[in-house]
From Swiss-Prot:
GO terms for cellular component: cell outer membrane. It is found in: Cell outer membrane. This is Multiple stress resistance protein BhsA. The keyword Signal applies. Pfam families: YdgH_BhsA-like. Residues 1-22 form the signal peptide. NCBIfam families: StressCuResBhsA (NF047859).
Amino acid sequence: MKNVKTLIAAAILSSMSFASFAAVEVQSTPEGQQKVGTISANAGTNLGSLEEQLAQKADEMGAKSFRITSVTGPNTLHGTAVIYK
């Protein structure tokens, strides 16, 4: 039982510290950061879901921030974003 509690506490703490390093969505080019690439993602009809997928891809690429540059599609949304480091 003690191991289960320790495991749960470790999982919660690791997710909290990981979130502090997550890429941040920005509205313009961040000062002191450079464009390092672009990413794209497809989602359902929910804009929030598309934003989450783009944020996850930005994190995987090691970006500090990302800026969504386009969103298209009436049924399945497709979005692109510029990533910065």
